[in-house]
A protein has these predicted regions:
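Residue-level signature for tetratricopeptide repeat
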Residues: 51-52, 82-84, 115-117, 154, ...
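Alpha-helical segment of the N-proximal tetratricopeptide repeat
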Residues: 33-69, 80
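Structural register within alpha-helical repeat arrays
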Residues: 48, 80-81, 114, 151, ...
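Long, acidic low-complexity intrinsically disordered regions
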Residues: 239-265
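TPR alpha-solenoid repeat register
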Residues: 44, 77, 110-111, 164, ...
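Structural motif corresponding to the intra-repeat A-B loop/turn of tetratricopeptide repeats
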Residues: 53-55, 88, 121, 158, ...
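Solenoid-like repeat scaffolds
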Residues: 31-37, 65-72, 99-106, 133-141, ...
Length: 265
């Protein structure tokens, strides 16, 4: 007796102008293991994940889950679903998908996300061990910088503020840089300096981050304004204290004058 097929779940709609050919060549190469029709469909869903990740996470998840159902052994599909879980703070699910993608592809380029997921699960020491693993040596420059940013955050979590600062003092920490990672690197460095108690340094680097953040990835401008206000308040309070001290000195002088007059009498 034949077992009836499980009915296929409805798939989220694809806009007419999305073809799947928008994908990076490396992802297209992964899709070649599928039938032509399936490759086109999975590619379209992966394009939609990227398009919706920042604006509609639930819709992005629907497309990512569809891609995994149709192409569960394609690393890019597992990475897409992992990124959705990562954005939602579902660390264990994200880590599981990233590990599956790494096993399928043999690539460790998602290592910064895996380390951050371990951090999200509260497993800081495991995260640091993973960041120092041999796989990290295979990362590109951009990926190594992203990893350094994550590791600096872990050091801050652990109260290791000096290490958080030193870990970001890379050759790429150049205030004039406008690479895609520049704003995030400057922002993380400012956070590390602030955690260490260097408000002036933090103010400087939040400023660099705001100028480098052409895509609005960070809230550097808000942090800059907030910190600038705090510094100004501290200065004003310092002036008030100085004025209070002067008033106290004037009062003491008046009392001394009164005592002198009493002595003359």
């Amino acid at each position: 007796m034949l077992t009836p097929k499980t009915p296929r779940l409805p798939e989220p709609a694809i806009p007419e102008d999305v073809t799947g050919f928008e994908l990076d060549r490396s992802v297209k190469n992964q899709l070649r293991t599928l039938s032509k029709e399936n490759a086109v469909g999975v590619g379209q869903h992966l394009v939609m994940v990227a398009a919706l990740l920042d604006s509609d996470i639930e819709a992005a998840q629907a497309h990512a889950e569809t891609a995994v159902r149709r192409a569960g052994r394609v690393p890019a599909a597992r990475e897409a679903l992992g990124l959705v879980h990562y954005r939602k703070g579902e660390w264990a699910k994200a880590l599981s998908e990233f590990r599956t993608a790494r096993r399928l592809s043999g690539s460790s380029h998602m290592l910064p996300f895996m380390v951050d997921a371990e951090r999200g699960l509260g497993r800081h020491e495991r995260a640091l061990d993973l960041a120092a693993s041999p796989e990290a040596a295979s990362l590109s420059q951009d990926e190594r910088i992203e990893l350094a940013i994550v590791v600096s955050g872990i050091r801050r979590d652990l109260g290791q503020y000096d290490a958080a600062v030193v870990g970001l003092q890379l050759p790429q920490l150049n205030a004039g840089s406008r690479h895609p990672w520049a704003a995030r690197l400057f922002y993380a460095y400012a956070e590390a300096l602030l955690a260490k108690g260097d408000e002036d340094g933090a103010l400087t680097w939040f400023g660099h981050a705001a100028r480098a953040d052409l895509e609005g990835e960070t809230d550097a401008e808000e942090r800059l304004a907030e910190l600038d206000g705090m510094v100004l308040t501290d200065l004003l309070e310092g002036d008030d204290d100085y004025e209070d001290d002067e008033d106290d000195e004037d009062d003491e002088d008046d009392e001394d004058d009164d005592d002198y007059e009493d002595d003359e009498d």
